[in-house]
């Protein structure tokens, strides 16, 4: 029948056990079994300690035998490393390590040496007072410190130079590699730490800019001679340098600018949202009025589960979301967005109403005149017909009242095929009837 030793990590609540044959297990074997069972690694970065749960005494002797059916507490702490001068000179930094659990994985138990007592041992304190014992303790410490000073005075000092500083210093010695440039003066024959302008207090030259953070698609390569161009001239021409040592200039984002111009033109053509606002139409019927916005119904929808009243789609959806899906008219709960039904008949009535308003007032759905919208589509810049002496459909007659546009005969284009001849300002005829009324010679 196998024996058992119960163990528990100090940071855990559950208890585990180690099975073995015999009446007891040494501390060394117990630590090795715990490391292997919990897969703690090779033991180079931690140290493992075992304590008695009752007295909290550490089992520091690897040869001590722990009897079976014993409960212990296991604690894992960081390893304590100590480096010697010889290990540093040999380049093996991790050779000397003190207080780790490597020996439990490799199977090499620790050999404890008996401490050698110095000659300055404490005398028999029996029959002495407390003041005498304190004085004896200070005297012993003073003797030990004097002995340590004598040993240190006879020791030979060994100076160690860091290898990392030596390697970093050797990297920046010699000529720079191809493509390297000093960002301070623009030279290619020296490192920036050896720049001649470092010791010049009057140097105010501008550094050459780098392309950090700029996408490559916005950079254009150029060919220049850096020997004949100063950093001030490069900064004036906005020339930058890449990590490969190539000279580039930044270009504009044409695609984004074209998209912005296209959206701006579409907004000008499509007009604004004023026709859906409250008070835009004075003769708006009540059946085409949105109960939420007070304006014309836009994409009318119905609440099929409650009052069955038409609302504007966007306004009703926002109202339902803000009120936790409560109908704004009859206050019925659980009116989800999926229950909204588009009202096709009401949408046709809205379109018919807009057509009537366009015929009555001569304005289209977007609030612009039909001919004006057609001119915007033909010329988005809005400059057509302003520089030429062409009569617009809304020209005025002698009385100053607008003249309705006269349809052109079939076959004649609505715009002149050839440019109009230049007419000086003094000879401009403002009223075409004056030419007929002038006396003929």
From Swiss-Prot:
Subcellular location per the Swiss-Prot or TrEMBL entry: Nucleus
Keyword Transcription regulation found: no
This protein's UniProt keywords: Metal-binding, mRNA processing, Nucleus, Phosphoprotein, Zinc, Zinc-finger
Positions of modified residues (Phosphoserine): 221
Keyword Iron-sulfur: no
Compositional bias per record (Polar residues), positions renumbered to this chain: 384-400
InterPro entries, A to Z: DWNN_domain, RBBP6, Znf_CCHC, Znf_CCHC_sf, Znf_RING/FYVE/PHD
GO BP: any one term: termination of RNA polymerase II transcription, poly(A)-coupled
Note: Present with 1130 molecules/cell in log phase SD medium.
Complex and partners: Component of the cleavage and polyadenylation factor (CPF) complex, which is composed of PTI1, SYC1, SSU72, GLC7, MPE1, REF2, PFS2, PTA1, YSH1/BRR5, SWD2, CFT2/YDH1, YTH1, CFT1/YHH1, FIP1 and PAP1.
Role played: Component of the cleavage and polyadenylation factor (CPF) complex, which plays a key role in polyadenylation-dependent pre-mRNA 3'-end formation and cooperates with cleavage factors including the CFIA complex and NAB4/CFIB.
UniProt-recorded name of the protein: Protein MPE1
Organism: Saccharomyces cerevisiae (strain ATCC 204508 / S288c)
